C-alpha cells in the first residue's frame, strides 16, 4: 500500500493531521513536546484510493538520549514511506528545528516531499499573505495549507497526494484469511515492547528503561504460517491513582481502545516478582472484555526453579485471575527468546476455537445427557429444565439455552453445563457465554446448522 510519512518538529500538529487523515483518533494529541515517540500507522481513504500514513515523533536538532531514539524511529519511517509530508505551522515563525527537519529531508533524493502548512485556519483564500512566503525558503515548492483541527484543506491535501503520485483506485483486499487482532497489555516494564521487537524481528517500538516509554497503541501487521495478524502494542497500564492528567490518562484510554479493537488479549506479567494488586486490576480489564486471553509469564529465566515452581506459579495465577480460568498460561523469556513460538501456536488454537460452529443436534444431545447425568438442584422454588439449545453468531462462543424459567438457574449448575460444553466440543482456551431464556422467547442471530 502507498505509504506517506508525516514529518516535522514537535507541536506542528502531526498527530492532529494523522487523526484527520485516517478519520480515527488513534494518535494522542497534546501540547507537550514529544508526545508521539513511536511510529503510529493508520489507513485513510479518498475517492476509492487507500493511503497508509505514519505519524512520527518530533525532530529537533538537540540530541538527548530519548530524542536519539525518536530520530531512529523517524528515519525508519522515512525509509518505509513512498512519499513524505513535511509539516510546519502557520501560526509560528520558522524555527531552527524546522530548518533541521528540512536539512534531513533534502538528503532524500528518491521520494516526493510535499510541504504542508498546518494551523492556517485564519489564512484568507486568494489573498497575499506575507507570513506564507517564508515557507518557500525551505526549497520544497508551493505549500498546501490546511487546518487539521478544523478539517480545512484536507480534501486538497488528499487530492495532491493522489494526483502527484498517480495512485490507482483500490478494489478491495483479495485476502480470504480473516485477520486476528491481538493486543499486549500489562503494567509498565514487564517486557511488552521487547516482546514485540522479537515477534516482528525488527526494532519497531521504543525500548527504554524509563517506565512508560510507550504511550500510544501501535498497529503492526504480521503474517505467520499463512495467518494474518494485527498486533496492537499498548502503553503499560498504571494504577488509576498514579495516572497523571493529560498524557497518561489518554494512554490509559488508548489501552482500553486497543482492548476493544482486539480479538485476543496477551496479558503479560513479570514471573520474577510476586503478583501485585496492579496485575489483578489489569487482569480485571482483560476479564471484562469477554474475549480470549493468553497469560504470558515473562522473565522466567530469572526465577530459581525446582520441579514444582511452575505448578506453584500457575496456582497463584489461577487464584489471582479466577475469572480467567480458561486462559492458557505460557512461560517465556523475551530476553533469551525462549518459548516465544508458543505464543502464535496458542493464538492459532484460540482462533480455531473462536470460529468453531457446533451442530444444533449435537449441542442438544450433550445438554440432555448432562441433565440426565446431573439433575439441576432446586433453586428459588423450582428446578431448571433446559429443553433446547442453540449457538448464536458472536465474536466468542455464545449459546442460548431455552428453559422452563431462567430464575431457576443456580450459578453452580450453569458452570456445570458450561464445563460440559467445553469438554464436549473443545472450547478449552476461550470464554463461552450461556444465556438462559424462557422456552417461549425468540432469539436472533442463531447459527445455521
From Swiss-Prot:
Residues involved in GTP 1 binding: 8-15, 55-59, 118-121
CDD domains associated with the record: EngA1, EngA2
Annotated ranges, domain EngA-type G: 2-169, 180-355
Keyword set, alphabetical order: GTP-binding, Nucleotide-binding, Repeat, Ribosome biogenesis
InterPro entries xref list: G_ENGA (IPR031166), GTP-bd (IPR006073), GTPase_Der (IPR016484), KH_dom-like (IPR032859), KH_dom-like_a/b (IPR015946), P-loop_NTPase (IPR027417), Small_GTP-bd (IPR005225)
Any one GO MF annotation of this record: ribosome binding
Single Gene Ontology BP annotation: ribosome biogenesis
Top-rank taxon, per record: Bacteria
Residues noted as binding GTP 2 in the record, renumbered to the chain: 186-193, 233-237, 298-301
Keyword Repeat: yes
Location of the KH-like domain: 356-440
NCBIfam families for this protein: GTPase_EngA (TIGR03594), small_GTP (TIGR00231)
PANTHER family on file: GTPASE DER
Family of the protein in this entry: Belongs to the TRAFAC class TrmE-Era-EngA-EngB-Septin-like GTPase superfamily. EngA (Der) GTPase family.
Oligomeric and partner information: Associates with the 50S ribosomal subunit.
Function noted in UniProt: GTPase that plays an essential role in the late steps of ribosome biogenesis.
Official protein name in the record: GTPase Der
